[in-house]
């Protein structure tokens, strides 16, 4: 029993809306209460009740090295002693920016911000300022943070909680957001045929991670690049999840497609609040103070996040991505076989160190097919795995994550737990 977690959740609901500071954490999508975490190390979470869980959420993506990696924590400890915020430039901003520019093919310059949402909203403003256009092409079920233009048919917590429409967002705002199904290039072509002269940008999760994991079909990203080139629009890759995860150079390196703008977050802060957006030099130089597109932030480039980011990227630059991907592929193959053996419909999408268990017989290639998965089966699976010490995302519309800290024994423990699940 998670008694202390339950007590804290009850108290939190009196003080914090829904008892949480981000909706999906409330575990409403899986008919459960949240666990309150006391500490984390490696692949493990430790709750306030003294329970230990093997973590396959990784703080929703940042912890690719696992929790409390010694090089990252040492860097943060050293940074704390130098001051937590200056409101002025620091050397580590330059160092981290150089590492990002060196790693990502589509980034000549980068601006640090404080979250993925801030990165995407700033990138959209820049795209509109650069092109002089207003409309945005977005994909149904993709999630780009909670800024108003992105909440039309969004994934992640919006999908988990089945929130209808966009309450609080003016219709005039989302009117400029044009929607297409993910992986449907023909639908995007139709949008450009109707609105091509008004479209400032396409924004896309190069690998969708917020409708569950959905990889791009062959030719999809290439087609988006071609359409943008033909119509003078910008291609924005949202790499908040995929950046430094699907390869050290992100999805753009893995798939060989160079976007005009890239948004980042999660991993580049090593677990501290951070975001960034970058792109071609001529576009990025339109940002104030060298250009007329305004964006600012009191804590942008703060020394703690910069130190954590530098240490994280240093370790990742010498990490065995191919080895981790091979281990995850073998693990997922066995997990799928175990679940299919129980007589339930199941498909597991996987790419790099991410995967999602979809309880459906149909291929999942977009949000519509993701919604065919049986939510009740996922809830049962989640509860039974959690009861055995396996911590999965409390939503069928999120990706599970495997870190470099996960051992073969950790993966075997999840497989053993899956064998004990009944439906």
Curated annotation (Swiss-Prot):
Pathway in which the depicted protein is active: Porphyrin-containing compound metabolism; protoporphyrin-IX biosynthesis; 5-aminolevulinate from L-glutamyl-tRNA(Glu): step 2/2
Keyword presence, Isomerase: yes
CDD domains from the UniProt entry: OAT_like (cd00610)
Listed cofactors: pyridoxal 5'-phosphate
InterPro entries (UniProt xref): 4pyrrol_synth_GluAld_NH2Trfase (IPR004639), Aminotrans_3 (IPR005814), Aminotrans_3_PPA_site (IPR049704), PyrdxlP-dep_Trfase (IPR015424), PyrdxlP-dep_Trfase_major (IPR015421), PyrdxlP-dep_Trfase_small (IPR015422)
One Gene Ontology MF term: transaminase activity
E.C. code: 5.4.3.8
Superkingdom assignment: Bacteria
Nucleotidyltransferase found in the keyword field: no
Catalytic activity from the UniProt record: (S)-4-amino-5-oxopentanoate = 5-aminolevulinate
PTM annotation (N6-(pyridoxal phosphate)lysine): residues: 266
Gene3D superfamilies documented for this protein: Aspartate Aminotransferase, domain 1, Type I PLP-dependent aspartate aminotransferase-like (Major domain)
GO CC annotation: cytoplasm
Keyword tags: Cytoplasm, Isomerase, Porphyrin biosynthesis, Pyridoxal phosphate
A biological-process GO annotation: protoporphyrinogen IX biosynthetic process
Localization per record: Cytoplasm
Record Pfam families: Aminotran_3
PANTHER family: GLUTAMATE-1-SEMIALDEHYDE 2,1-AMINOMUTASE, GLUTAMATE-1-SEMIALDEHYDE 2,1-AMINOMUTASE 1, CHLOROPLASTIC-RELATED
HAMAP family: HemL_aminotrans_3 (MF_00375)
Summary of subunit composition and partner proteins: Homodimer.
Similarity remark: Belongs to the class-III pyridoxal-phosphate-dependent aminotransferase family. HemL subfamily.
Protein's UniProt name: Glutamate-1-semialdehyde 2,1-aminomutase
Organismal lineage: Bacteria, Pseudomonadati, Thermodesulfobacteriota, Desulfovibrionia, Desulfovibrionales
């Amino acid at each position: 029993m998670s008694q202390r977690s339950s007590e804290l959740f009850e108290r939190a609901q009196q003080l914090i809306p829904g008892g949480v500071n981000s909706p999906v954490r409330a575990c409403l999508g899986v008919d459960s209460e949240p666990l309150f975490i006391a500490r984390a190390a490696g692949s493990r979470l430790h709750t306030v009740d003294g329970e230990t869980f093997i973590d396959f959420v990784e703080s929703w993506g940042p912890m690719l090295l696992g929790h409390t990696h010694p090089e990252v924590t040492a860097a943060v400890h050293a940074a704390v002693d130098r001051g937590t915020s200056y409101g002025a430039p620091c050397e580590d901003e330059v160092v981290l920016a150089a590492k990002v520019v060196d790693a990502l093919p589509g980034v000549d310059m980068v601006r640090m911000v404080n979250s993925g949402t801030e990165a995407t909203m700033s990138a959209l403003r820049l795209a509109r300022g650069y092109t002089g256009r207003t409309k945005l092409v977005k994909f149904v079920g993709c999630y780009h943070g909670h800024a108003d233009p992105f909440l039309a048919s969004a994934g992640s917590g919006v999908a988990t909680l089945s929130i209808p429409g966009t309450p609080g967002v003016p219709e005039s705002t989302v009117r400029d957001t044009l929607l297409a199904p993910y992986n449907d290039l023909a639908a995007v072509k139709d949008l450009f045929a109707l609105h091509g002269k008004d479209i400032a940008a396409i924004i896309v999760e190069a690998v969708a991670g917020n409708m569950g994991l959905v990889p791009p079909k062959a030719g999809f990203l290439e087609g988006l690049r071609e359409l943008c080139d033909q119509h003078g629009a910008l291609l924005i890759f949202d790499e908040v999840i995929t950046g430094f995860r699907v390869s050290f150079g992100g999805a753009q390196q893995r798939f060989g497609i160079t976007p005009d703008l890239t948004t980042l977050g999660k991993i580049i802060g090593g677990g501290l609040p951070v975001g960034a957006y970058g792109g071609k030099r001529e576009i990025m130089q339109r940002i104030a103070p060298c250009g007329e597109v305004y964006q600012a932030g009191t804590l942008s480039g703060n020394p703690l996040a910069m130190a954590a980011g530098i240490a994280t990227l240093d370790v990742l630059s010498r990490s065995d991505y191919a080895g981790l991907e091979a281990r995850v592929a073998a693990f997922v193959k066995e997990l799928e076989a175990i679940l299919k053996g129980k007589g339930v419909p199941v498909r597991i999408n996987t790419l790099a160190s991410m995967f999602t268990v979809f309880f459906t017989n149909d291929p999942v290639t977009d949000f519509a097919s993701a919604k065919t998965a049986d939510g009740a089966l996922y809830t049962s699976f989640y509860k039974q795995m959690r009861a055995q010490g396996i911590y999965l995302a409390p939503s069928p519309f999120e990706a599970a994550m495997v870190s470099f800290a996960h051992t073969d024994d950790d993966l075997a423990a999840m497989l053993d737990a899956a064998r004990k699940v009944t439906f």
